[in-house]
Design a protein with these regions (language model features):
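Intrinsically disordered, low-complexity, positively biased terminal segments
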Residues: 1-197
Length: 197
């Protein structure tokens, strides 16, 4: 396994960890991790791997889904993008997890959560923000919820893997209102988890 750190005058730009493997047509560089501080770091890392082309037939690289790879490569004829996103995550304490999802000053939202493995996660939770402080309160049983989800969908919303609209395609997810606040609390963003379980 090889590890390389790429820097400029201001400090680290990116790092690359890869392992040589035998492929069908020759040696493949299997990039286990590629992290970059800014777009220039990604360009430098890809350029570095390109310079190793005499030793490797190809490189297999996992990148965040929001990286416009075709726009970065001048000649992307030999790229074969595939979608291999299998992140594993699970909320184990709903109240603490929702604490990180502020609704916006003076706003609140409610989420009904169902968790078949951890009964303490079941219930309707109200998340409020006042004076910069976020509070999460478990409401009495039967309270109305703006959003109803199981813990798996909640986890995907919390890490930004799903947008609110995408979550609505999942079975058992219902939206009753407060759409604008829920959008602010659960924005979609690139999920880039490279740890293997």
């Amino acid at each position: 396994r090889y590890t390389y750190l790429l820097e400029d005058a201001c400090g680290p730009l990116a790092y690359v960890i890869f392992k040589p493997e035998e492929g069908e047509d020759g040696k493949i560089g299997n990039v286990r991790e590629l992290a970059f501080a800014k777009p220039e770091g990604l360009r430098q890392a890809l350029g570095f791997l390109y310079r190793l082309g005499a030793q490797y037939e190809a490189f297999r690289i996992a990148l965040p889904e929001d990286v416009p790879l075709a726009a970065l490569l001048e000649e992307s004829y030999d790229t074969a993008p595939t979608w291999i996103n299998q992140p594993m995550a699970r909320v184990i304490h709903v109240e603490k997890a929702l604490q990180a999802k502020a609704p916006g000053e003076g706003r609140s939202y409610t989420v009904a959560v169902e968790d078949q493995l951890l009964p303490g996660n079941n219930g309707v939770f109200q998340v409020s923000q006042q004076g910069g402080a976020v509070t999460v309160e478990k409401l009495p049983e039967g309270a109305q919820a703006d959003l109803s989800v199981d813990v798996r969908v909640l986890t995907q919303l919390l890490i930004g893997f799903l947008s609110l609209e995408e979550a609505l395609y999942k079975p058992g997810v219902t939206l009753s209102g407060n759409l604008e606040t829920l959008h602010q609390a659960f924005p979609k963003r690139a999920a880039y988890l490279t740890d293997l379980f």
